């Protein structure tokens, strides 16, 4: 009876953690890309995933879901003012199906032709700014809350057009190391500024319930795929479960 009651209490305690979109107990995610070959380096090979390759990946026993990261097909320049310093750089945008997001972002939608673009950035960008760029430039560190209120100037050029937009940071991601915009924006903007034609996904995100399965490594090596994600959360999950087991056993 003690074990049963302990298990019920443990379930109640971890339920809020499991239900969070960035929970380490909701499966593991790998971002896959193809190894860059000599042909890719000189522009003679394709680094994208074909529809047949995506279908084969979905059929693997260790795969729950597969989502393609869709890249922007045009040039992007971003600018922002911080501490009296104006910063400008080239950017890249990608989109991913909403079910793969680990952020509950308000206003994560886009109406075609709107000048406002909601953006999700990697959380480590905040750390890079606070502990790398800011000290070297004599700029103040900023909190995540302030970071979310930063407004970016976005200039998009392509297909003979140049237009200005405003980027709003609406969330910070622990899962995806890319600058994310809504899928609706990528599709609309690629149609307006892109070169035309369907672009193959150069990266895909895979949800798996067996992140340390040797079959995954063997499959990736055999196909020439590389996994970009780390597995820090696997260690956290193992530690948590050890504590839970120890508590119930006692």
Task: List where the protein language model places each region.
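Membrane-proximal extracellular/periplasmic loop immediately following the first transmembrane helix
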Residues: 15-92
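Short hydrophobic beta-strand that contains or immediately precedes a catalytic carboxylate
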Residues: 90-93, 119-121
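A structural signal for short, well-ordered beta-strand segments and their strand-loop junctions
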Residues: 65-69, 120, 229
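Basic-flanked hydrophobic alpha-helices used for secretion and membrane insertion
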Residues: 76-78, 104, 111-112, 117-226
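Short, strongly hydrophobic transmembrane alpha-helices
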Residues: 1-15
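Alpha-helical transmembrane helix bundles of large polytopic membrane transport and channel proteins
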Residues: 81-85, 90, 100-113
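Peri-transmembrane interface segments
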Residues: 210-250
